[in-house]
Amino acid sequence: MYRLRTYYEELMPYVYYVGAAAAEVVEKSKAMAEVVDVPCLVRSPHGSGGSYNYAGSCGIPSILIERGCTGVWSKEEVELGKEDVRNVLRYLKILEGKISGKIYKPVDVENVIYKNASHTGCWYPTKRAGDTLKKGEILGWIKDYFGNVLEICVAEADGILLYQVVSLSIIRSGPMVAYGENVDCGQIDKW
């Protein structure tokens, strides 16, 4: 799945690791992800779409760290991201030193549901990235300019909201929400 990176997505900090590759590549990728200080480790089901997935399909363990959102990041997020990279390099024995301590005890997310908009219109989300959700809960509505509901986005499973569009404008076939299914959300540290 190819997904154009947007600057209108709100996301919680998490890390993708290669999941559609040889077992040893997946194992090494997950081990790399485990040294990143985020609440969730997300196993990617894709073998293409993004450089980290392509690397995995070529036998190269890889991860994608998601931190910051809407094209904005704080100094703290930059420092956390840099420390994450240093920890991965330490794990790989490319950089000397001990892997630094972590704030989070990450939860595994192996099944992610990606929902794209079926209509162009105005998006009204009901949740925030990092919120837990229950199957059947309304995650948001797409309305026209007159307030008529064009689409209702409903959670297909219990889980945690990884990211969502937060702009008023939403485009047909564009990303709307992504959430991890059946996650033991009680174990997730709030970021």
Feature-to-residue mapping (PLM):
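Structured catalytic-domain cores with a bias toward divalent-metal coordination
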Residues: 1-191
